[in-house]
Design a protein with these regions (language model features):
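N-terminal hydrophobic targeting/anchoring segments and the immediately downstream early-domain regions
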Residues: 5-23, 28-177, 232-376
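Active-site core of metal-dependent hydrolases
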Residues: 170-264
Length: 376
């Protein structure tokens, strides 16, 4: 230290000494900004329209009852409610619904099942994580539309019409034929509208997305996707699709996936902010939200996780449902923590968005539209 100091000239020393008061003055300002962001996040209804309290995408840690680390992440997340995927085949879907209802019964101070709109505000008040049970496919109903009624009674409130491939309802985003909504699909949408189940078009192909928007009498949702104009990716949506969705009162949830910007590395906060900026420009401030597509617990890139991640991607490729960029890290490193949506607040504040707009994007818009959708 003394040797380094001896090389500083008087002029340099004076400059450093003069800067010291400025640095000292800046520290409280930075702290105040951090407190303001934390306060805004803490008092807002925060909704992640695709997340999971356990493992998400990659099955590591192994799926099952919540671990202590996963429960700690839920407590610290500050998230009010999430759309948690329970879809599988018929038996698997019933089993997954029972699993999460069992976890909510086991940890009532931590989790609650969202069945009606008022349950979201109750989750905020009671400081529980509200679980909105949802499907990312319609395979479990096969061609029996009455199963929608059964699953509604079991607690399903959000249903994505297709995954990446084709089913009886329509075409997913990786289907080259790009067929639209089938006649059965139109009947499914009508029944979902009547029951009060949200129509989700996130993974749907371009034509099925357009048809789903047109067919739905209730606001259609795109719970976890992005803007194709910002980064060309089949899992994201064209501006015309986003405008049509917003025109029907729907909301887009911007995801945190590597599909938001160019690789080969991990996605970044800047990429996410560009997506949010563009979505607001195209859709308007009342039609943009968050759908991270992540677990509430941070991803730890252990050898076990990396092994399972490779198996996950390889398995999807063999089934023909793997999207481009899936070999990249499936998370934003700077936001790889339970309070990741607080990072969105910080990023939007740095971009000079107002408090009102930030509150809408981190949960207010989805909270509003779900009231309209779930009122049968």
């Amino acid at each position: 230290m003394t040797q380094t100091l001896s090389r500083i000239t008087r002029r340099e020393f004076a400059a450093i000494a003069g800067a010291a008061p400025l640095l000292a003055a800046a520290a409280p300002t930075l702290a105040a900004r951090q407190d303001e962001v934390a306060g805004l996040y803490g008092r807002s209804i925060v909704i992640d329209m695709l997340a999971n309290p356990g493992s998400m995408n990659v099955s590591w840690p192994p799926r099952g009852p919540l671990s202590e680390k996963q429960r700690d992440a839920i407590r610290s997340s500050g998230i009010t409610a999430i759309n948690v995927t329970v879809s599988s085949d018929f038996e698997g879907s019933v089993r997954n619904i029972a699993l999460w209802q069992g976890e909510a019964d086991r940890y009532p101070e931590l989790l609650s099942i969202v069945r009606r709109h008022s349950d979201i505000a109750a989750a905020k008040q009671n400081k529980t994580l509200g679980l909105m049970l949802g499907f990312q496919n319609t395979d479990m109903i096969d061609r029996d539309i009455t199963r929608l009624d059964m699953f509604y009674r079991l607690g399903i409130r959000i249903v994505q019409l297709t995954y990446n491939d084709r089913n009886y309802v329509g075409d997913g985003c990786l289907e080259q034929a790009n067929g639209g909504l089938s006649q059965f699909g139109r009947e499914v949408v009508a029944r979902m509208n009547a029951l009060g189940i949200a129509v989700d078009l996130s993974h749907c192909g371009t034509q099925t997305t357009a048809d789903g928007i047109a067919a739905s009498a209730k606001p259609p949702l795109i719970t976890h996707s992005g803007c194709r104009e910002v980064y060309r990716h089949p899992r994201s949506k064209e501006d015309r699709e986003l405008k049509a969705m917003a025109g029907k009162g729907g909301v887009l949830g911007v995801y945190f996936m590597p599909f938001i910007g160019p690789g080969p590395g991990a996605p970044t906060v800047e990429m996410l902010m560009r997506q949010i900026d563009h979505a607001i420009k195209v859709c308007g401030v009342d039609h943009v939200g968050i759908g991270s597509d992540l677990s509430t617990m941070p991803i730890e890139e252990t050898p076990e996780y990396l092994r399972e991640a490779k198996a996950f991607v390889d398995g999807r490729a063999k089934r023909g449902i793997a999207a481009p960029d899936e070999t990249r890290p499936l998370f934003i490193p700077e936001l790889n923590h339970p309070r990741r949506i607080e990072g969105v607040v910080r990023g939007m504040r740095q971009r000079k968005y107002s408090t009102e707009v930030i509150e809408k994007v981190i949960g207010g818009n989805f909270h509003r539209v779900l009231k309209e959708i779930w009122t049968s």
